[in-house]
């Protein structure tokens, strides 16, 4: 097993948790998928699909760095000659939901968007709980840590709005120390 296998397993579980969570609430996004980069692309794609207004629930892989004793902070690896340093990696994710922004001049539209935002908040909370349970029940991740950052609304731009959270997941270093 390598870090590729571990992160593939974590990512699949996280996406499944997210897709299950959003599908259980009104206004489920039309798309639930991985995204790459630093910001999810959610405007009209080349096929003319408006991912923003159809709704997009996403999981993005972020930074990866050595982190064990100071998790979730980056370790300073001073023992580079030790074959098993670092003992762990931090894997960062961003998990979110993108939607059409409501009409700022229409109170009814704003109230509906506010209610949908509450469902999105609940979906992201449920995603976190599901993923935490997955990590806790998977033997290869026993003793590893999770750090959940705050859930935040993104800026409203291009007619879209977003809610997301970031988290760091610790995995054992099986790349430098396979045994």
Please place each PLM-identified region on the residue numbering.
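A generic short-segment signal for beta-strand/edge and adjacent turn/coil regions
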Residues: 59-66, 128-140
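Short, charged interaction patches at domain edges and termini
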Residues: 1-32, 86-90, 134-179
